[in-house]
């Protein structure tokens, strides 16, 4: 982070330091996780707990994406990806269409994703579509049960997702799950 700031001529921001501290904790936990997973005895006995993810929110232009990119580049993990949340949901809908008729397609989809990625970094987590709101809880729950960790940026606190949206009650369990599974950090 410090190196990237200097290279770009940016100045450190006090509010960003809360996000950086949360991401540093997450990165440290990933380093510890990798060390535990490297132990053959541990591999046979049980999986160590995955690092707790981070939900970093704040206004436009607060540097959330920049901070997350620094984290993504530094985290010692090969099975990771970073993408825009809208792009991710578009791909989810495409794959759900392919899985039409399959029992519990969101579980199948989460298992597929977990084979490729342990960590997913979402930029601009935002729900604007009723269809997304309706499937989000089952999708996130399946991802967490399939041992995936999430780090995300958003312009909104989780409670502010999909305000006044059609069938907003359908997204409330997903919001609670996000708050339970991720460390929520305000960078304003």
Predicted regions, residues:
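Walker A (P-loop) phosphate-binding loop of P-loop NTPases
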Residues: 61
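Short hydrophobic/aromatic beta-strand immediately N-terminal to the Walker A/P-loop
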Residues: 53-57
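Short glycine-rich substrate-engagement loop in P-loop NTPases that contacts/grips substrate
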Residues: 80-117
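Hydrophobic positions on the alpha1 helix immediately C-terminal to the Walker A/P-loop
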Residues: 67, 71, 84
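Phosphate-binding P-loop
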Residues: 29, 34-36, 42-51
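Conserved lysine of the Walker
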Residues: 64
């Amino acid at each position: 982070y410090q190196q990237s700031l200097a290279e770009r001529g940016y100045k450190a921001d006090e509010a960003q330091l809360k996000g950086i501290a949360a991401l540093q904790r997450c990165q440290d936990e990933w380093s510890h996780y990798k060390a535990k997973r490297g132990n053959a005895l541990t591999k046979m006995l049980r999986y160590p707990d995955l690092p707790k993810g981070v939900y970093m929110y704040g206004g436009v232009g607060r540097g959330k994406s920049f901070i997350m990119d620094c984290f993504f580049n530094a985290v010692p993990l090969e099975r990771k990806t970073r993408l825009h949340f809208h792009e991710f949901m578009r791909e989810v809908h495409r794959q759900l269409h392919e899985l039409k008729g399959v029992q519990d397609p969101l579980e199948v989809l989460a298992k597929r994703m977990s084979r490729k990625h342990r960590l997913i970094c979402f930029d601009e987590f935002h729900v604007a579509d009723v269809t997304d709101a309706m499937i989000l809880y089952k999708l996130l729950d399946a991802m967490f049960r399939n041992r995936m960790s999430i780090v995300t940026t958003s312009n909104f606190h989780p409670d502010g997702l999909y305000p006044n949206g059609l069938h907003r009650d359908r997204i409330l369990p997903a919001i609670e799950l996000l708050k339970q599974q991720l460390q929520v950090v305000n960078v304003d």
